[in-house]
Regions:
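Leucine-rich repeat
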Residues: 9-12, 32-38, 57, 77-80, ...
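Conserved hydrophobic beta-strand positions in leucine-rich repeat
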Residues: 13-18, 38-43, 60-61, 82-86, ...
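Acidic/polar low-complexity surface segments
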Residues: 45-66, 101-112, 117
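The feature encodes a structural signal of leucine-rich repeats
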Residues: 3-6, 26-31, 51-55, 68-73, ...
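Exposed regions on extracellular, virion, or secretory-pathway luminal proteins
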Residues: 68-71, 102-124, 167-180, 192
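Consensus "Asn ladder" position of solenoid repeat domains
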Residues: 21, 46, 64, 89, ...
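Leucine-rich solenoid repeat scaffolds
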Residues: 126-203
């Protein structure tokens, strides 16, 4: 399954939902260059079959981006997205650390009294994204620092929509993140203005 090349002519497209299409990989045409005005990208539930243990199944063409060799780093470089949904797929491997990506600068952090010092020097990944969902994939390894201290992490309902994985990978690993925090107490130590804000939003 692939998107037609003419999709790239939709330069003014702002919202794209291609969930439930059984893609084996994320279509190459999906780039910020092809969709400069896109702010919401939904790629959820592309599984053709529901397979809990990928190491114990020989079916082909099962969808769920199962042929992606690793987590699609290029999607994480799409800075204009405010919504990114990748839930209920077969993405495997670790979340990339994005060490070569643009970093938060001291000037940016000091210009906003709601941003903590710990951000300085961390990769500035998906800075505008208020909805980020990668739950029910087959991800493993460590959660990267750019995610653990992301300014909008609390808006992402991380224990439901980010940290929660399921099943086993193709090589038989149990899924889940080795450094999943027990709570967000560490986070609110760096974002004290958020903890008692009922909407979990930083003050403008």
């Amino acid at each position: 399954t692939e998107l037609h090349p003419d999709f790239k002519n939709l330069k003014n497209l702002e919202y794209l939902d291609i969930s439930s299409n059984c893609f084996q990989t994320i279509p190459d045409i999906l780039t910020p260059e092809n969709f400069p005005n896109l702010h919401a990208l939904e790629l959820n539930a592309n599984q053709r079959h529901t397979i809990y243990d990928l190491s114990n199944d020989i079916r082909e063409n099962v969808g769920g981006f199962i042929d992606e060799p690793k987590f699609p780093e290029r999607i994480l470089k799409w800075n204009n997205l405010d919504t990114l949904g990748l839930s209920v797929n077969y993405l495997q491997g670790e979340l990339p650390k994005m060490l070569d990506h643009e970093k938060w600068t001291a000037e940016e952090v000091h210009a906003c009294d709601t941003l903590p010092e710990i951000l300085i020097g961390l990769p500035k990944v998906l800075p505008e994204t208020e909805f980020f969902a990668i739950n029910f994939n087959r991800l493993t390894g460590e959660l990267p620092e750019w995610l653990l201290y992301h300014p909008k992490l609390d808006l992402w309902y991380p224990y439901s929509l980010v940290f929660q994985q399921e099943g086993k990978t193709r090589d038989g690993q149990n899924t889940g993140f080795s450094n999943e925090p027990a709570s967000l107490d560490y986070y609110y130590q760096h974002y004290p203005k958020k903890k008692y804000n009922p909407n979990n939003r930083t003050e403008e």
